C-alpha cells in the first residue's frame, strides 16, 4: 500500500511560526515519525509540500493510479480552495484530512471547511500526533476496502 502525504502552505514553517498553536516540531520531524511508522507497517509513503494551490492540485491529480490513499493538510487552503476540493473529489481516493490545531475552536473564518465534505475522514486538534492517527485510520480504511473487494471477488459468478 502506498500513501501520499500532501502538506499545504506555511507548513514548511512549522517549529518557527505560532508555536503556541502549532507546537515546536518541524515538518521534517513529523515526516520522520511518519516514515518510521510506515516502515513498521509495511507502507510505502511519499511526502509533498507546497505553498502554491496549483501545485497541490497537480500533486493530488498525480496520485490517481499511483497511490492507494492521501493524507492532506491543506492548511489555509482548507477554507478557500474549491480547486483542491474538486481535485480530491476527482481522484476518488480514500483521503484523510489533518489539521494540527482544532480549526473549529479558532477564528470564525477557519470554521469554513471546503474539503472535509469530499474527504473520507478528518483529524483535527491532536497536534503533530494527528498525522499518526491519520496513518492508523488510513490503514484501517484501506484494509476495509481490500476486504470488501476480496469478498466481491468470491461472490462473483465463476466463468464457465
Swiss-Prot record:
Pathways per UniProt: Metabolic intermediate biosynthesis; chorismate biosynthesis; chorismate from D-erythrose 4-phosphate and phosphoenolpyruvate: step 3/7
Keyword Lyase: yes
Record carries keyword Iron: no
EC number(s) from the headed UniProt entry: 4.2.1.10
Site entry (Transition state stabilizer), positions: 17
Residue stretches in coiled coil: none
Official protein name in the record: 3-dehydroquinate dehydratase
Record organism: Sulfurimonas denitrificans (strain ATCC 33889 / DSM 1251) (Thiomicrospira denitrificans (strain ATCC 33889 / DSM 1251))
Lineage: Bacteria, Pseudomonadati, Campylobacterota, Epsilonproteobacteria, Campylobacterales
Chain's gene name: aroQ
Amino acid at each position: 500500500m502506498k500513501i501520499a502525504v500532501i502538506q499545504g502552505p506555511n507548513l514548511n514553517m512549522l517549529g518557527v511560526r505560532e508555536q503556541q498553536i502549532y507546537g515546536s516540531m518541524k515538518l521534517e520531524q513529523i515526516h520522520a515519525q511518519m516514515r518510521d511508522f510506515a516502515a513498521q507497517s509495511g507502507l510505502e509513503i511519499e511526502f509533498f509540500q507546497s505553498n502554491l494551490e496549483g501545485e497541490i492540485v497537480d500533486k493530488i491529480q498525480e496520485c490517481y493510479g499511483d497511490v492507494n490513499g492521501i493524507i492532506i493538510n491543506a492548511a489555509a487552503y482548507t477554507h478557500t480552495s474549491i480547486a483542491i476540493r474538486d481535485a480530491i473529489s476527482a481522484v476518488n481516493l480514500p483521503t484523510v484530512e489533518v489539521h494540527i490545531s482544532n480549526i473549529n475552536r479558532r477564528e470564525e473564518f477557519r470554521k469554513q471547511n471546503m474539503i472535509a465534505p469530499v474527504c473520507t475522514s478528518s483529524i483535527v486538534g491532536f497536534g503533530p500526533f494527528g498525522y499518526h492517527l491519520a496513518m492508523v485510520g488510513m490503514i484501517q480504511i484501506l484494509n476495509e476496502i481490500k476486504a470488501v473487494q476480496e469478498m466481491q471477488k468470491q461472490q462473483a459468478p465463476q466463468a464457465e
